Amino acid sequence: MNTSPKMEMEMKMETKAAPEAGMIKKSNEEWRTVLSPEQFKILREKSIEKRGSGEYVKLFEEGIYCCVGCGNPVYKSTTKFDSGCGWPAFFDAIPGAINRTEERAGLRYEITCTKCDGHLGHVLKNEGFPTPTDERHCVNSVALKFSSAITSQ
């Protein structure tokens, strides 16, 4: 079937708007009971943490980064790199873990968790970083929970 770009965009929007199995839906009051005030401000109100203030900016230990709101694994430490931007940076997410919403003509996208729709940060493209994707997923530390792959013996 031959479709116009407008029809393709509408079909994508319809697909994204469909409720997903396992999606977590809570009221703001319910979110406030499980998130700290700072987590709520970022995940639910789409705010941003102060540059360089996040606990995961300089962490390069092996493990998995999960959405702090719902525990959904969103990034592997193997995709993390030091971009010098002041927030944790990744070049790719775990497949199916994030949604992207275009904000700046294909150069910047808001990223949210596919399971709870929590705001994680932004993806910026074509900045010239020597990564496999030429993308920088600039993520708020407060939106993440790190699980180390290193176990105590």
Curated annotation (Swiss-Prot):
Zn(2+) binds at C67, C70, C113, C116. Its cofactor is Zn(2+). SUPFAM superfamilies: Mss4-like. One of its GO terms (cellular component) is cytosol. Disulfide bonds join C85-C138. GO terms for biological process: protein repair; response to oxidative stress. Its main location: cytoplasm. Binds 1 zinc ion per subunit. Keywords: Cytoplasm, Disulfide bond, Electron transport, Metal-binding, Oxidoreductase, Redox-active center, Transport, Zinc. The active site is at C138 (nucleophile). One of its GO terms (molecular function) is peptide-methionine (R)-S-oxide reductase activity. Pfam families: SelR. Residues 28-149 form the MsrB domain. Catalyzes the reduction of methionine sulfoxide (MetSO) to methionine in proteins. Plays a protective role against oxidative stress by restoring activity to proteins that have been inactivated by methionine oxidation. MSRB family specifically reduces the MetSO R-enantiomer. This is Peptide methionine sulfoxide reductase B6.
